[in-house]
């Protein structure tokens, strides 16, 4: 019986080890509530100031993104809307958010047994963010940041309530969206790159914006407002929510 029990426990541990490639901790340091979103796993969670949400991401997860929604109101059924980052009017996101939203993107256990991850401003900016491995290592396995006052300094043509749109969202087309082949930076994308050099500023900004860590031995942390305050022009208190589901 002892052998069978030990074998069962070993098998269970092996299954857990195989299933989850990384734990991702999402923390809200903003002085207002953020409704975190995560797809294709996780869904969504209300995070008051100082709260944390832990996501267990399976091996092989790809095209994954985490973002913060602001100015949300949800009812007890998890339906409502957000000023930025809304994902179809639901608390539990199954699709991507509506720009603008600062994105933490990742793909786990890809070729060469590496995790690939980045901060992207291709969908614009709404909340300052840090994305970091919990145990940094050599090469491109280190913390990355986008904490500039982008909302306050946003060009007038890109400014929207609660955030700053990427020019691809605002104007579309090959020049800004790289829809028909290679394209380079523009004066508007350089606005983002100058302030957040770690982050994607346009769709083909790969060389300076993609980071890697060893897969299976690295966990991650996403922090909204790592410095505690978003920027002087962003409201310190967002509208109260009736959402009681995910407190």
UniProtKB/Swiss-Prot annotation:
Keywords: Disulfide bond, Signal, Stress response. Residues 1-21 form the signal peptide. Pfam families: Thaumatin. Induction: By abscisic acid (ABA), salt, salicylic acid, wounding, and fungal infection. CDD domains: TLP-P. Disulfide bonds join 30-225, 72-82, 87-93, 141-213, 146-196, 154-164, 168-177, 178-183. It comes from the Eukaryota. Belongs to the thaumatin family. This is Osmotin-like protein OSML81. It comes from Solanum commersonii (Commerson's wild potato).
